[in-house]
Amino acid sequence: GLAVDSTDLPVCRAYIERLESQGGKYISSSKWNNTVLMQVPDEAIALRFLDNSFVRSIKKVWVSPDSIMPRNKDRKEQVKNQWKKQDDYYGMGAEQIKIHHGDSLHLAGFKGKGIQIAVIDAGFYNVDAMKIFKNTTILGTHDFVNPSSDIYGEHNHGMKVLSCMAVNTPHVMVGTAPEASYWLLRSEDNDTEQPVEEDNWAAAVEFADSVGVDIVNTSLGYYSFDDPIDNYTYRQLDGHTSLMAASASYAAKKGLLVVCSAGNSGMDEWKKITPPADAEDILTIGAIDNMGVNAAFSSIGNTADGRIKPDVMAMGVHSAVVGVDGGTAFANGTSFASPIFCGLVACLWQACPWLTVRQLIQVVHEASDRNAYPDNIYGYGVTDMWKAYQLAMKLKADTDGK
């Protein structure tokens, strides 16, 4: 077990009640970062919060949008649940698993059973209506953007991300961790791009920790916001400046493995990874094609403090996903490279539950094809997951022998 420290204590309830008495509406808090999210009708009330001795600073993170896109009330009618069977057991998902020898882990009986994965994303459109998810174990859902919304009526991005790991329909599509259990958490508001989404993410990852999650996949990243004053600079990619990176770094200290997409800014002026991909002791995943060549759009490292990023690469070009109609489709993005790899790491952790987060990351690095010469494009390269398993077994034998 891990020692309890001050970051395990909730934000003082008396402080929250004081802010409420001054006109604030409580939304959420982060015990790890010692922050609280309050909604106020005007800025003057927020400024009065500074009169309290327990308030160090305030920051505007959300402005109510002028309009919100209407949700599709007839969403389930979009689902056709039609697909073609393939000869290969993995169906459309074969290439993205076999490029890492993930099928060897599966053949050895390690398909993620007993591992809990939280997917923190933008919505899980129609997952509840798609037969292709019928063999997927979903433990629960929570919406940190709008707790009263229908998480299955929100954006389809999280559904596609989930499918890379969780689908278990042989000869149609089998994901990388078909026997793991999943929490579906929404932190991303697709209608706007505001810093509050970092607060939502911080609340979501702390919730994941509280319910016993082992691994978090997040195919989200932020550096540019609706108000340019909130934008990050490269110098801030230090693993601690952004709230999300700080929370992801804390998660690692609490024993959670965070697997994160590198970002799709490789061809933009920004080019770099996006927070929380700069966090410490997490796995940041870039995108390759089925030949192992990096995707031009895949964001590059390193972090501002010189750590190698991305960590490793997975298929993010022509990745097999579930489409909005419930059939299989292909998509591009580090958003899909991340869950593909996340599922494989879940299988590895099932096989080697004695590994710490840092040891997991270590064997992943050592089992990758550029381990001897990592760079800021490929990181440590493409991981052989069977080799990672063998290295983990050797590590245990060496440790037990001492």
List each language-model region with its residue ranges:
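Substrate-binding/access-modulating region of protease and related hydrolase catalytic domains
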Residues: 106, 168-171, 184-278, 291, ...
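Structural recognition of the beta-strand scaffold that forms the well-ordered cores
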Residues: 28, 35-39, 59, 116-121, ...
